[in-house]
Amino acid sequence: MMQARYSVADPNALGVVPYLSEQNYYRAAGTYGSMATPMSVYPAHEQYTPGMARSYGPYHHHQPAAPKDLVKPPYSYIALITMAIQNAPDKKITLNGIYQFIMDRFPFYRENKQGWQNSIRHNLSLNECFVKVPRDDKKPGKGSYWTLDPDSYNMFENGSFLRRRRRFKKKDVSREKEDRILKDQGKVQGPIPSLELPKHDKKIVIKSESPELPVITKVENLSPDGGSAMQDSPRSVASTPSVSTENSIPDQHPASNGFSVENIMTLRTSPHGDLSPVPAVPCRTGMVPSLPINYTQTQSSVYSQACTQSMDTSGSYQCSMRAMSLYTGDRPSHMCAPSTLEEATSDHHNGTASPLNSMSLGSGQESVLTSSHHQQTATGGQTAAPWYLNPGADISHLSGHNFGSQQQTFPNVREMFNSHRLGIESSALSEHQVSGNTSCQIPYRSAPSIYRHSSPYAYDCTKY
């Protein structure tokens, strides 16, 4: 059997050992003659052929077995023990059964039994994947049975005993079981809290944030025939003052498109002297955030249409705390608005009242706007210029009023709103007191000719 493995194609080659070939080869004299020249030392070499064949016959069979079967198998002791246990009929085997299985399967372990059997015992006791099962039957024999832990069957990769994943430990198995249970529970119950609820929360947050902008624009878009929106504006805006002061600024242009054209068309039809102030800021109701809201967005929508008519100079519009409005052009005189709607209508010329007078106001509400703003005539298609970059006109000659820097940025406006809010909460001002802490100043680009007043509109500020 082993000679067939080592048969060679050319037995006459010099490097081939003769006894590795078939034995009948030595009886053939013709084939041996080719080796006569190198082996001329032996005159009668044919007489050695039968003797060589017989004398070395037993040795020939054992010699090729040494390099093949005496090589150590590439399996670990754990793999050898696992093979023995899995080949047992009951998946359990004694220590002697493990020894016998290894020696029958691998001839390498037929020698040096003391060394590798000691290693087998160490691996059985040190590895948790092998479980010792005591004998419970009355069968003859000694020694306990060894079996595999049920969780260690996947210890080797793809069933190959050459590669083991990692050292088996019961702690790792218990952790893996807990992880599997948690994962299984997470698959059943996990999608509801982990996936759907955050989406639902996100939807709720978006719905709670997005209506703020439409609510602000809806409150601030004052139509000439909608008085209820004016009454609701301080309450609805007061709930979100911080959002209104910041978010109302970018929305001034969309708001101006829906409101300013209608309002200007109404203002064109009415005479200049008969226009009464628009009720815009209810100051007595205590709704502080209504000041920045009404003057940042709605009033800018009215006046920004006329901003394109200004050439070089510009006016400044100041709303004081006690419902006093100052609109200046190039006149050195002090122009103040009447404090209430009744005074405005009584002090003005008796004529056809503007439709803006029909807006209903709550009790004690004061409005601050003079008719000079409504004398603007501008086309609705013109684009509203942003009022942040407008340099204010020279209005330092006006006494009794404090004016801020002529070029205002939005943080300064916010600081004025905060100081204005603090001024309202700290002390009640008298009617003639107007200071920088209780005023919000917003510059508007406008031509001086638009803000010029005729003599009947000049009111003395000391009157208030």
Curated annotation (Swiss-Prot):
Per the record, the GO terms for biological process are: insulin receptor signaling pathway; lymphangiogenesis; mesoderm development; positive regulation of DNA-templated transcription; positive regulation of transcription by RNA polymerase II; response to hormone
Q: Basic and acidic residues composition bias: which ranges? A: 171-186
Annotated Gene Ontology cellular component terms:
nucleus
PROSITE patterns assigned: FORK_HEAD_1, FORK_HEAD_2, FORK_HEAD_3
Compartment list = Nucleus
Keywords assigned by UniProt?
Answer: Activator, Developmental protein, DNA-binding, Nucleus, Transcription, Transcription regulation
Q: Where is this region: Disordered?
A: 168-196, 220-258, 341-366
Please give the Gene Ontology molecular function terms for this protein. chromatin DNA binding; DNA-binding transcription activator activity; DNA-binding transcription factor activity; promoter-specific chromatin binding; sequence-specific DNA binding
Spell out the Polar residues composition-biased ranges. Answer: 230-258, 351-366
Gene3D superfamilies xref list: Winged helix-like DNA-binding domain superfamily/Winged helix DNA-binding domain (1.10.10.10)
**Record's InterPro entries?**
Fork_head_dom, FOX_domain-containing, FOXC1/C2-like_FH, TF_fork_head_CS_1, TF_fork_head_CS_2, WH-like_DNA-bd_sf, WH_DNA-bd_sf
Source species, domain of life: Eukaryota
Question: What SMART domains is this protein classified in?
Answer: FH
Q: Does the keyword ATP-binding apply?
A: no
Residues annotated as DNA-binding region? Answer: 72-166
Question: Mind telling me which Pfam families this protein's record contains?
Answer: Forkhead
**Function as written in the Swiss-Prot or TrEMBL entry:** Transcriptional activator. May be involved in the dorso-ventral patterning of the mesoderm.
Q: Protein name, please?
A: Forkhead box protein C2
Which species is this UniProt entry from? Xenopus tropicalis (Western clawed frog)
